[in-house]
């Protein structure tokens, strides 16, 4: 049955839009305060909302805007008690036919006022089940389950004022008292209604609960009036002290790779606990069962094990002057991996992983007393020959032989020679740990345990040579008998360490914790023993050891208690009298124990503080008139990578890239005055010399808002702020909204440091809210509470600035010169993996359609505030819906080039299809730490299938005679092991590849599936090998292929899986632009005659199309891009680390454009670049760079589109008959019987590859840009495998500009282009099934960013 046998009825498509009003015009009036510091606008908005919650009013920067629809009256702010209203600056109206793509300022503010009005009435009617949260609402189904509901408004050109409803599950839960009890899970906290990121000041949430502030009633009433949140009658309302994220308050999304880290500031805010929500990290796993506690009697055994560990750390490592030869203990061939040849490569960290395996998770969680006894019984007896001479020279070994046996039972590798890293063929007891990425990266001596991710740092210099801290213990009592004398407690550094840890149970002193933390009561044997130092190493040749048996042991000197590294400082006595005491006490690091830590105090400026998340930093074109001509060029060169502007929170809505007026290009750049901010860095001084101590930490960015001219919320508490309006505030305003939290016994101190202007600021800050309460007043006392909540009532962060998914533990990469090559390797592994690596458990949630009840809160509320409420159907918003045919791809069969439909990919192994552009051969080498038969069969079968499918030839490399072909078994993946392996690869390549064509060597490395850390670690291991080999043989090409470890352990693997893996290897081999298949050229259905007459800009035909998709992480740390042409013959992926640096971002943009121009140079004729910005957003700083770069290339025509697979607009399918496969899912009896003699008349169709194009009647607003609208909107849609009644898969495409006059034709061309290259997902081994309706280059960028955004880049200092 043909999929197009029936016609599709647009009436059966339900959209997520609901018509609420029929608009002819929208009236508006703008009020501007008389002075920049006037709070009249804030007071007026609250009073209007108190009088009428349905009023359409909004704050925008320093202005108050009032709106009405059609003939309704404008809400007037002329009310008593708030002073004389200022003159209206602007009054007028606009119609639905507003300009695009840049929305006029009144329309954008109208949408904001509409959304605020909907939120307030929803919350009032729902009895706080719907709580405003940023620019959205949180619907609480119960105490733990909740979802986010969006109410987005849009005015169509036909006058339909609509509200779009959608929901998204981001895992928000209401903060409860027991949320942080027990083992701490690093959850993210947020404040409602602002959506600001916050932190707990103490790990125990019970310590964060505080008494209500004295102006609590004022705050609750303000919440009721401004947001509809009614907590005034709440019983047992709890108040909690939280630390807000000031960066997020100012528009910066906290770095997602460090999202779970604690705040760097101690300034706090007191907030109702019912308005606090938590978000759990994706990798949080709550263990309901605890491991069996170790018996107390094992303490002595662990002491003996520790003695033996220290013995091995030093005695196996020889130093000059020792009596034992360096190769005696190992006796290995210097040419083999792990022999004496490794001494030149071995740093001290080599011994960490191999000899300390009892620190791993197995020794803590698996080693119960009963299991330890079972292992001891089953252990084979060991002879003295098992140890090298280096071990036997150490005294007291025989006394500790029991611990030696225990150590070998627990960790068999601990008794092996440290240099025997390769030739050991034994399989580890825990094969997962053998490839665990906990091995050190580079030369760092870090051991990460599996379950608790704890680090143990071993300083070998101290253990080997003995530093100044160990001199007093060097000749101490080394007898084991002292360990049994529990009354002996020698004063050591470890005692103070344990004291600090005991006083800090949450691990603040030692953030990473200790490697072993056994909960025992008998921990008295704390003396450190030096049994591991051989006699010939601790004696000098000229001074023989004194061996008088009657001589007493040296008396150890007690150690001094640890002191601060900063204070007190010791100075030369000659100058000590001239040194100021503050330097002796540590300077800025000094701390007075009598000082009082108090919550952060905010003050609010009405100059550019708004209740919008998009327009808090509005500025006008007049701001640029004051710029001096000599500074204009410097400001132009400055990037507008602002926190608010990046995601359109501070974009000037009334100005946008006027192409005709070059002077107006400066509107892209903000020119904020420093006085138009609220200063968080200025706090009242306590003493004159301690002013700087209490400053809030600077924003941890290279481009601070001060440097790029951004508005920052900072409470100016020194009286120099914007709120100093003495004449406007009378003595009757007695609110205490900004005073510090009182502390018992500190009244006099607070009085001394409270300035006169601080009192005035406190009074006028509360006046904005106290005016809505009526007669409510708060007497001014000498000690007053802090109610620093006004900024969290005025700011509303967009949900887009909050990550959908974050992790509590993130992999780390070093930001150095090698990072670019590392990212290139990593991107290829992430993109062309055919889904083998998994989704890393970081799949973001998607928007879903909302099904409304007939008598639900949403329907009743919208019916009460609007004149109508009717859902729009497809025929009302869609102008055209058309079927897009599948493209044909080029492949080879029996040596001939053929064309076949793109959905035939699943039959490729059965049809014996070959690559269209020739074979690629390679040499293979699989590295593992475990020798199993499945690993041998896996690599052998892989090589056989690759050659049998005629993809090329695969030669399995054999480095040594005793190895299997293509398989190397390593003892570990430590640095020294890999360096030695690199030396053997160099030897092999120089011997076997001199007179042969340069065939690349592909190294296969096993990784744990869906493991971020394993992927990063193994990629870094390969980069180490690659750099080492290419430093000696630059012409050798090394490639990487990560293989999931489960795949190598599976003895039964389907041939199809092998074939998919082989085709993925083919796509990775050079030349990388040559893939298995490409789009075939089709003959045109009609011939078009084009002449050169007329304006070239009006020509709508292009000879070639280049597609560039890119996205930038919401924290501005990473940038990813992918290139493709319309046939897929040109393809490339790349990523950059930005680190929130404007210089790096500009460099990345320049490089990105350079690569695009190079690709365009290989094309001919008129070329159109389809610049695709993902996430349905286009920040101004990015657009500025594209405009700057596009003018440098005249033969490259730029078309900018914003796309999104998960947007707030959804289409619900109710058609039961189209496409024709729907009846088959409903009832299989509708299927026709297949006629065996007419098989040639049938056609096999993959319904996952059947796509339709949609063109909307009116352009849609960008989902995450409130001030920008498309000039034409469309989508690629796919029907799901069901009988109907489900949401369509939709890939939304919004065209922002058109190089010619026919935007509809260009949009349809782009939809056809996207459909064609979307069919390459499976052929390029990028995606299978799920994302086949999305172009491959968009899917590639999405896969890169989904992973790399959780990687923590560490700058080298």
From Swiss-Prot:
Belongs to the Mediator complex subunit 13 family. Residues 356-391, 420-487 are annotated as: Disordered. Its main location: nucleus. Residues 435-451 have a biased composition (Polar residues). Component of the SRB8-11 complex, which itself associates with the Mediator complex. It is found in: Nucleus. Keywords: Activator, Nucleus, Repressor, Transcription, Transcription regulation. One of its GO terms (molecular function) is cyclin binding. The keyword Protein biosynthesis does not apply. The gene is SSN2. It comes from the Eukaryota. The keyword Transcription regulation applies. It holds the Pfam family Med13_N. Component of the SRB8-11 complex. The SRB8-11 complex is a regulatory module of the Mediator complex which is itself involved in regulation of basal and activated RNA polymerase II-dependent transcription. The SRB8-11 complex may be involved in the transcriptional repression of a subset of genes regulated by Mediator. It may inhibit the association of the Mediator complex with RNA polymerase II to form the holoenzyme complex. GO terms for cellular component: CKM complex; mediator complex. This is Mediator of RNA polymerase II transcription subunit 13. GO terms for biological process: negative regulation of transcription by RNA polymerase II; positive regulation of transcription by RNA polymerase II. PANTHER family: MEDIATOR OF RNA POLYMERASE II TRANSCRIPTION SUBUNIT 13.
